[in-house]
Amino acid sequence: MAKEKFERTKEHVNVGTIGHVDHGKSTLTSAITCVLAAGLVEGGKAKCFKYEEIDKAPEEKERGITINITHVEYETAKRHYAHVDCPGHADYIKNMITGAAQMDGAILVVSAADGPMPQTREHVLLARQVNVPYIVVFMNKCDMVDDEELLELVELEVRELLSKYEYPGDEVPVIRGSALGALQELEQNSPGKWVESIKELLNAMDEYIPTPQREVDKPFLMPIEDVFSISGRGTVVTGRVERGVLRPGDEVEIVGLREEPLKTVATSIEMFRKVLDEALPGDNIGVLLRGVGKDDVERGQVLAQPGSVKAHKRFRAQVYVLSKEEGGRHTPFFVNYRPQFYFRTADVTGTVVKLPEGVEMVMPGDNVELEVELIAPVALEEGLRFAIREGGRTVGAGVVTKILD
């Protein structure tokens, strides 16, 4: 048998389950895979994952932070989904802030028996902060509630919560169902209304979460890792293409670490010592730049489509501060704390200039919003992830939520 080729015929979308502890996120992830694996959705495909397999999530490291994440994949008739589930509340916060697994849409799981709880709110707020663009709601455990009015009330509360954090609460699909009920129906070989609720959820995901713009279609950007001078030819910068396409002859800008961007032309592109006619996201390339001296460009800048990205010094960010057990600080920090901020390939000293009202200090293990001023401008945009380091160790991870200059 020849090996099956990964077919790129279906659109690819990244999703994940979010919500309060014990509201059934991992059970829902299991139910989705098992309903699809049972062949109950036309054109659907999956391997059935049991709850235990999802709950014992393997550890991953992202920006020096250990996170437990389970990845599953499945297909509907229209799409290929990559789906992430985290067992612990802290894992969610870390995943959302570090962007270890970025989501094009989230499935908010709310227990019909309990309604929205503190972590429900926290996850929705975080989803908004880190730019998760769409949310679909699965009201779980509806088999435990016989009171129609109570279900109406919980749905209303969830919609109000979403609206409060600037999601369109009135339009968001809310599916009533039971993940455990669906798994039990499958076991008894009698798919009924709870399996139907899982199919409804998949349909809502297909219809409501748009296919994201592909990295290839975005404006070109490559963080500069290294700079070489090649005698007789000029200056070459190397790095991995983050997004967009670069072709020889394209105009580019070198942005960051200097007051003004520098315009130049990419005269040739090489990968593995071979000349390329186009560089795509993920390619590790060397780019020969016209008329640029070795001292005009340095690691930490980015090569970008002109006008597509600007350098900034001041920003607001949502930050997760590592606990002592995770190798972070042992003591709190205060306003005027001055660590190193790592953006892509840039590492720049910055000062924490503002903490939230009423917050005097930030403890290891906290998740906090703060304002930072860098000593040199860096190519920044909302949604960009960064690490905070001090004395050679990672002490935090963050995401830019607003540019302030």
Swiss-Prot record:
Residues 64-68 are annotated as: G2. This is Elongation factor Tu. Residues 19-26 are annotated as: G1. NCBIfam families: EF-Tu, PRK00049.1, PRK12735.1, PRK12736.1, small_GTP. GO terms for biological process: translational elongation. Residues 10-213 form the tr-type G domain. It is found in: Cytoplasm. It comes from Aquifex aeolicus (strain VF5). One of its GO terms (molecular function) is translation elongation factor activity. Residues 140-143 are annotated as: G4. GTP hydrolase that promotes the GTP-dependent binding of aminoacyl-tRNA to the A-site of ribosomes during protein biosynthesis. Mg(2+) binds at residue 26. The gene is tufA. Its EC number is 3.6.5.3. Keywords: Cytoplasm, Elongation factor, GTP-binding, Hydrolase, Magnesium, Metal-binding, Nucleotide-binding, Protein biosynthesis. Residues 85-88 are annotated as: G3. GTP binds at residues 19-26, 85-89, 140-143.
